[in-house]
Amino acid sequence: MQETTILILGAGAWGASLANLALANGHRVRVWSRRGTETLAALLEDVDIILSAISMKGVREVASQIQSLTPSPETIFVTATKGLEPETIYTPSQIWQSCFPNHPVVVLSGPNLSKEIDQSLPAATVVASRIATAAATVQLAFSSSRFRVYTNPDPIGVELGGTLKNVIAIASGVCDGLHLGTNAKAALVTRGLTEMVRIGNCWGAKTETFYGLSGLGDLLATCNSPLSRNYQVGYQLAGGQTLAQILAKLPGTAEGVNTCQVLVQLARQQNIVIPITEQVYRLLQGEVTPQQALDELMLRDIKPEYN
């Protein structure tokens, strides 16, 4: 395998996990963080891949900083951030592509809980790009006997799968926190996936992408693991804590909280029916209790499963 120089943006749990995967494959790895002492300008020198694992709120600022430094035209950008920009409703890859229109941008997303990756437990992920050679380069850089990487030509679908499932994960935490049982959980995850597909189709994503690792796979992992911050938000809301109390002690960012608000705004503009997401939004806003949100979902007008 050809040795590659990779710059990881973000020294949080996910950034550190990805850095370790690349190091284990023999690549040269540099890590940038806001608290670090090295400048972006110094770290960018002779870099082949720039991988962003920063939180959604920092993406545009960091992309703009790198834009001003004029990276090599051969540099591949990879985004492993899951979220939406509130002002533009852009995904992370759309922000990177708008800043670097002549560079390949690759999305990395899948059912990847960083703690399990760090324990070398087997996992799989997806790298997606319109530029097949760029996706293949990233695939080779991160694939190993414990981390299987697939390519996909639908970057927006792969990216939205990882982003939209965070909202359903909050609902899943509520479901478990209220002890609603396996039947309710199965119904919630399945109907949540339907909402993800509806929103994704509006964006031009392929339906089948949502039934792959970055959609259903990530949804199942996040909705069933206490390791998920979004799941924890829902679980603790069901336990009677306020959103402010939960976020104050949460390690890291629960992107689903911000994503939910953006999705509801989009759905109302585009007339997309997303009842689970709507109830999560109302719960986060303090407009309903977890039990009231459940009742409103169960008492909706009856209808066919598929329109």
From Swiss-Prot:
Enzyme Commission designation: 1.1.1.94
Catalytic reaction annotation: sn-glycerol 3-phosphate + NAD(+) = dihydroxyacetone phosphate + NADH + H(+); sn-glycerol 3-phosphate + NADP(+) = dihydroxyacetone phosphate + NADPH + H(+)
Binding-site residues for NADPH, renumbered to this chain: 14, 34-35, 82, 114, 229, 255
Subcellular location: Cytoplasm
Alphabetical UniProt keywords: Cytoplasm, Lipid biosynthesis, Lipid metabolism, NAD, NADP, Nucleotide-binding, Oxidoreductase, Phospholipid biosynthesis, Phospholipid metabolism
Membrane-traversing stretches: none
Cysteine-cysteine disulfides: none
Any one GO cellular component localisation term in the record: cytosol
Protein residues bound to sn-glycerol 3-phosphate: 82, 110, 165, 218, 228-230
Biochemical pathway: Membrane lipid metabolism; glycerophospholipid metabolism
MF term (GO), any: NAD binding
HAMAP family listed in its UniProt record: NAD_Glyc3P_dehydrog (MF_00394)
Family classification: Belongs to the NAD-dependent glycerol-3-phosphate dehydrogenase family.
Name of this chain's protein: Glycerol-3-phosphate dehydrogenase [NAD(P)+]
Organism (species): Trichormus variabilis (strain ATCC 29413 / PCC 7937)
Lineage of the species this protein comes from: Bacteria, Bacillati, Cyanobacteriota, Cyanophyceae, Nostocales
Gene transcribed to yield this protein: gpsA
